[in-house]
Amino acid sequence: SLHRPPGCRHCVGQLRLCDLDTADAVEEMGAEHVPCPVDDIVVDEDNKVVTTPAYMLAQNIAEAASGIEKLVARVLVLTA
């Protein structure tokens, strides 16, 4: 199981497109779900967590790639 710090901000997708049960479960664990399109990221600077909906929303690997590339770039910035 994944551990997320209380109050951690992250995404599982846009509200109208994401799995609402997953978004609700995330919030029940004390995290904040931030709606986000497949090609973007959510950054929690305080907890140094970066998320993208990627496979949760993508219709193909090309759609997921944009968000994944942004995520990797931001993780590298956070670790510098």
Swiss-Prot record:
InterPro entries: Class_I_gatase-like (IPR029062). Coiled coil: none annotated. Keywords: Lyase. It comes from the Bacteria. Gene3D superfamilies: 3.40.50.880. GO terms for molecular function: lyase activity. Displays glyoxalase activity, catalyzing the conversion of glyoxal to glycolate. However, this apparent glyoxalase activity may reflect a deglycase activity, which could be the primary function of this protein like other DJ-1 superfamily members such as PARK7, YajL, YhbO and HchA. Is not able to use methylglyoxal as substrate. Homodimer. Belongs to the peptidase C56 family. This is Putative glyoxalase ElbB. It comes from Klebsiella oxytoca.
